[in-house]
C-alpha cells in the first residue's frame, strides 16, 4: 500500500505517527541544508521537509531531482508545527518514485500559465490536477448523490430506459441516426415516452439519470450534444403545480447539499453559493412577455422565449426579485410538445413549465395528457403520425393515470449553480459540434 492517508486526513491526532502519502510533485525547493517537497493529491497539498542531518543521504539527494508532476509515494512521520505552511509537515523516511512525467508538460497544473479551454479539454487528465477544476467535479459528484438520495427519500424508483430507439421521442429532427442491423434507429434525445409508459405500470414515481443525445448544431456556452439528464415522472397528480413543487425542492436540496458538503471546494472556487428561497417565483408566459416588452424586447405571442429574452428575464428577476431561480409557466400550446396537457377551458394554453437559473433554462416539464383520444389528436396537430407512436399509445388504452414530470439538465444545473462561463467546464469529455475526442 503506497498510501494510508489523503492530505485532508492528516490531523493532529496523527502527530508523531508514521503515515504514507502519495501523489504528484507540486513544487520542490532546495535551500542547501534543508529541502522541501510538496506533493498534491485529490484533497490538497502535503509538505515534505527533509533536513540534511535527519534524513537518509540518498533520499536527500533524490528530492532536487524530482520534476513537476512526477508521481511519488512518501513514508514518514507527521510533525505539526506552526513553521510549516500548512500547519504540519512530514519528515520522510522513504520516497519512492512511481513514475516520471515527461517535459514539457502540455499545460501548467498550477494555473500560473493560462491555457485556452481547448488545450485544457485536449489534456483533461492534466487539467483535473488544477485544484479549481478538481473542485468542480467533486461538486458535480455531490449534486448527483444529492439528487439520487432525494428521489429515494421521496419514494421514487430508479429506472433505465433504452438509448437506441426507433422513432423520435418528441417528433423532432435533431436526432443522431444509426444502423441497427437491417433497420434505421436513433440515439435517444430523451426518455420521455418510456417514463410515461411506466406511469401505466403501477410504479407511480420513477426517475432516471442517464445520457441524452441531441444532434443540434449549436456551438454555444450552454449546449452539448451528449449530456446527462435527470428525468422524473409521477402519477396521480392533479396539476402541474405538484411537479413544480417537487422539482424546486429537489433543486434546493442539491444546492444545500453542496453548501454543506463542499465548503472547501466552494472556497477554492472563491464562490459563495446562496441558500435558495422556496418557493421559487412563478412567472406566467404572458407576464414574461410583458416584462420583456417593457425592457424593449418584443416577442410575438405563441413564440418561445429566445436566448436574449431568457437573459433579460434572468437579469430582471435578480434585480427586482433577488431570484436566481424561477419558473416560467402557462405556455402557448403550440410552443410545447404533443404530450403536454392543455387547459380544458383555454386550450391555447398548456400545463408546461420551464425552470430558469440565472437566465438559462435548466429544466422543462409539465402535466402530461393521459387521455388516449385527446393525445392522439395532439399528435396529429403536430403533424406527426400516431401509428409511429403505437408502442407508446398502447399504454394509454388500458388505464393511464394523470401524471406529470420533468427533465433537468445536470450540466446546466451545475454550470448555473457555480455561475461558470461555459458548460464544457462541468463535463469531463464534452461532445459538441467540433469535439469527438478525447
UniProtKB/Swiss-Prot annotation:
* InterPro entries found in the cross-reference section: Aa-tRNA-synt_II, aa-tRNA-synth_II, aa-tRNA-synth_II/BPL/LPL, Asp-tRNA_synthase_2, Asp/Asn-tRNA-synth_IIb, NA-bd_OB-fold, NA-bd_OB_tRNA
- Keyword Magnesium included in the entry's annotation: yes
Q: Which molecular-function annotation in GO is an example for this chain?
A: magnesium ion binding
Which reaction is the catalytic activity of this chain? tRNA(Asp) + L-aspartate + ATP = L-aspartyl-tRNA(Asp) + AMP + diphosphate
Q: Where is this region: Aspartate?
A: 192-195
Temperature-dependent activity: Optimum temperature is 60 degrees Celsius.
**Cellular compartments per GO CC:** aminoacyl-tRNA synthetase multienzyme complex; cytosol
Q: Print the keywords alphabetically.
A: Aminoacyl-tRNA synthetase, ATP-binding, Cytoplasm, Ligase, Magnesium, Metal-binding, Nucleotide-binding, Protein biosynthesis
Q: Where does Mg(2+) 3 bind?
A: 361
Residues annotated to bind L-aspartate = 170, 214, 364, 368
Q: Does the keyword Transmembrane helix apply?
A: no
Binding-site residues for ATP, renumbered to this chain: 214-216, 222-224, 361, 409-412
What GO biological process terms does the UniProt entry carry, in alphabetical order? aspartyl-tRNA aminoacylation
Residues annotated to bind Mg(2+) 2: 361, 364
Provide the cofactor list for this protein.
Mg(2+)
At which residues is there a site annotated Important for tRNA discrimination? 26, 85
Reported function:
Catalyzes the attachment of L-aspartate to tRNA(Asp) in a two-step reaction: L-aspartate is first activated by ATP to form Asp-AMP and then transferred to the acceptor end of tRNA(Asp). Is specific for tRNA(Asp) since it aspartylates tRNA(Asn) 3 orders of magnitude less efficiently than tRNA(Asp).
Stated family: Belongs to the class-II aminoacyl-tRNA synthetase family. Type 2 subfamily.
Give the quaternary structure.
Answer: Homodimer.
Q: What is this protein called?
A: Aspartate--tRNA(Asp) ligase
Biological source species = Thermococcus kodakarensis (strain ATCC BAA-918 / JCM 12380 / KOD1)
Amino acid at each position: 500500500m503506497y498510501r494510508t492517508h489523503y492530505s485532508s486526513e492528516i490531523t493532529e491526532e496523527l502527530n508523531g505517527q508514521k503515515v504514507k502519502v502519495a501523489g504528484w510533485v507540486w513544487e520542490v525547493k532546495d535551500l542547501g541544508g534543508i529541502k522541501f517537497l510538496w506533493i498534491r493529491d485529490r484533497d490538497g497539498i502535503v509538505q515534505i521537509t527533509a533536513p540534511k542531518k535527519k534524513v537518509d543521504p540518498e533520499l536527500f539527494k533524490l528530492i532536487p531531482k524530482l520534476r513537476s508532476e512526477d508521481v511519488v509515494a512518501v513514508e514518514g512521520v507527521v510533525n505539526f508545527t506552526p513553521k510549516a505552511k500548512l500547519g504540519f509537515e512530514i519528515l520522510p523516511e522513504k520516497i519512492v518514485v512511481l513514475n516520471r512525467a515527461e517535459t514539457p508538460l502540455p499545460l501548467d497544473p498550477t494555473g500560473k500559465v493560462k491555457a485556452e479551454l481547448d488545450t485544457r479539454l485536449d489534456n483533461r487528465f492534466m487539467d483535473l490536477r488544477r485544484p479549481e477544476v478538481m473542485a468542480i467535479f467533486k461538486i458535480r459528484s455531490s449534486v448527483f448523490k444529492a439528487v439520487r438520495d432525494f428521489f429515494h427519500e421521496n419514494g421514487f424508483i430508479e429506472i433505465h430506459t433504452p438509448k437506441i430507439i426507433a422513432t423520435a421521442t418528441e417528433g423532432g429532427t435533431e436526432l443522431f441516426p444509426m444502423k441497427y442491423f437491417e433497420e434505421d434507429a436513433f440515439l435517444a434525445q430523451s426518455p420521455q415516452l418510456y417514463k410515461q409508459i411506466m406511469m401505466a405500470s403501477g410504479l407511480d414515481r420513477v426517475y432516471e439519470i442517464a445520457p441524452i443525445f441531441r444532434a443540434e448544431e449549436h456551438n454555444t456556452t450552454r449546449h452539448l450534444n451528449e449530456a446527462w439528464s435527470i428525468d422524473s415522472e409521477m402519477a396521480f397528480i392533479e396539476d402541474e403545480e405538484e411537479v413544480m413543487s417537487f422539482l424546486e425542492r429537489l433543486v434546493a436540496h442539491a444546492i444545500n447539499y453542496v453548501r454543506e458538503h463542499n465548503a472547501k471546494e466552494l472556497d477554492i472556487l472563491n464562490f459563495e453559493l446562496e441558500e435558495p428561497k422556496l418557493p421559487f417565483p412563478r412567472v406566467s408566459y404572458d407576464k414574461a412577455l410583458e416584462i420583456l416588452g417593457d425592457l424593449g424586447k418584443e416577442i410575438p405571442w405563441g413564440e418561445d422565449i429566445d436566448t436574449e429574452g431568457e437573459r433579460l428575464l434572468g437579469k430582471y428577476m435578480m434585480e427586482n426579485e433577488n431570484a436566481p431561480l424561477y419558473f416560467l409557466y402557462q405556455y402557448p400550446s403550440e410552443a410545447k410538445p404533443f404530450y403536454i396537457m392543455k387547459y380544458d377551458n383555454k386550450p391555447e394554453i398548456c400545463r408546461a413549465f420551464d425552470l430558469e437559473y440565472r437566465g438559462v433554462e435548466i429544466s422543462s416539464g409539465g402535466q402530461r395528457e393521459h387521455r388516449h383520444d385527446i393525445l392522439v389528436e395532439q399528435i396529429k396537430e403536430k403533424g406527426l403520425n400516431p401509428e409511429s407512436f403505437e408502442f407508446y399509445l398502447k399504454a394509454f388504452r388500458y388505464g393511464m393515470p394523470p401524471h406529470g414530470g420533468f427533465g433537468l439538465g445536470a450540466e446546466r444545473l451545475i454550470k448555473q449553480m457555480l455561475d461558470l462561463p461555459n458548460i464544457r467546464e462541468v463535463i469531463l469529455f464534452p461532445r459538441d459540434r467540433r469535439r469527438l475526442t478525447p
